[in-house]
């Protein structure tokens, strides 16, 4: 569904809308329940990441407070970020990690064809989890050397240390490849 002037529920597709607190906007929840009842849907399985699991939690709690027991809400975790609590490897992470590793291996080949010194910085998705950025070292599995530096959002980032490290590496080689987590913050 998408929130425009009023909520419009679609029968397929994706959703990037966070449900509001039911005390503020119970209409959203009632619209979902009406839709499920209209099509005789008694089990709602929502596949996704943190925001999707938040929706599952809110809808499930709302159904419980209303005493609605004929509709079941199930959350199936899937996120490339690999940051869902209670899971070791989230569905979606493995293929994304492989893609990141392959991309860095190919990027390395591209970076080393020139004699000119260059620094390539790649920001890797993952919000507040550095799993995908760490997966950039999978480039090594196929004979590449992988990124020269990997900066994870879980580790404090110092711009001074970063610049010193890059400068030193550029004195050793012509190309420097860096993987940086999307959630890295300057300290």
Model-inferred region functions:
Residues 35, 46-48, 54-66, 70, ...:
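Accessory alpha-helical/coil subdomains and C-terminal extensions
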Residues 42:
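Short acidic/polar active-site loop segments enriched in Thr and Asp
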Residues 1-9, 187:
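Single conserved hydrophobic/aromatic residue that forms the stacking wall/gate
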Residues 28-39:
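Short, well-structured alpha-helical segments in soluble
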Residues 6, 10-30:
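Phosphate/nucleotide-donor binding subsite
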Residues 10-18, 78-88, 115-118:
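Gly-rich Lys/Arg/Thr-decorated short loops/hinges at beta-loop-alpha junctions or inter-strand turns
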Residues 6, 75-79, 95-101:
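Catalytic or ion-translocation cores adjacent to nucleophile or general acid/base/metal-coordination motifs
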